[in-house]
A protein has these predicted regions:
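Detector for outer-membrane/organellar transmembrane beta-barrel domains
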Residues: 134, 144-212
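Outer-membrane beta-barrel and related beta-rich outer-membrane complex signature
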Residues: 48, 75-79, 129-131, 167, ...
């Protein structure tokens, strides 16, 4: 994903390769899947993004272990080719952008209204500090409700402590798709332990229309 940006306040521009991702997915067995994804140029840096194995023990149940994006928010889970704009929203890029190493369990409830719940435990220190030992619990959970065709409601909660300050985040988002329209809104609230920093409020809303 190459782009050119011009900063009006500076009167300067730049070319940039924002992403050049390569992904490999497959199944070792019908009930065992894997994924490995690397970004060959994340603003000029090579980054290993995903490296995990996923089990499907029974219908509707998934168990995942490895390096992955944690279950949190709507927009942060979109790959670059799924983004609606050249740049990601602040929720996806700065406030809710978390990849980590850990273990998750997901389950799709056998109900009339499709409900998928996923939660997991993680190191809480990101992708590069995997050798550190942790005493604190770092978790993230997400629930998705598909009330009707095209209507999605997502609720998320996350609690991590990468260093001395614990961060607690809550997110609610929804989108509706009808015809060529995609209407979406998302709100994220983040607070820090012991009032270490001011609370964070982030909002992402947009309407997209696909041209014929």
């Amino acid at each position: 994903r190459a782009k050119y940006e011009y900063q009006t306040t500076m009167g300067a521009g730049r070319f940039e390769v924002r992403n050049a991702r390569v992904s490999v997915t497959g199944n070792v067995l019908p009930s065992v899947a894997y994924k490995a994804e690397i970004d060959l140029s994340d603003e000029g840096q090579i980054k290993m993004l995903d490296a995990y194995a996923r089990l499907f023990p029974t219908k509707g149940l998934t168990v995942t272990a490895g390096q992955m994006r944690v279950p949190f928010t709507i927009d942060a889970h979109r790959s670059p080719h799924q983004q609606y704009f050249p740049n990601r929203s602040f929720i996806a890029k700065q406030v809710g952008n978390v990849r980590d190493v850990g273990f998750t369990v997901g389950y799709t409830l056998p109900t009339d209204v499709p409900i998928t719940v996923e939660g997991g435990l993680f190191n809480g220190s990101g992708l590069t500090n995997q050798k550190e030992w942790h005493k604190e619990v770092n978790y993230s959970a997400k629930a998705r409700f598909l009330f009707t065709k095209g209507l999605n409601l997502t609720l998320s909660v996350q609690s991590i402590q990468p260093e001395e300050v614990r961060m607690q985040s809550y997110d609610i988002g929804a989108y509706y798709e009808t015809g060529r329209f995609h209407i979406e809104g998302e709100y994220l609230y983040k607070q820090y332990s012991d009032n270490a920093f001011k609370d964070v409020h982030a909002v992402n809303t947009f309407i997209n229309y696909d041209l014929p």
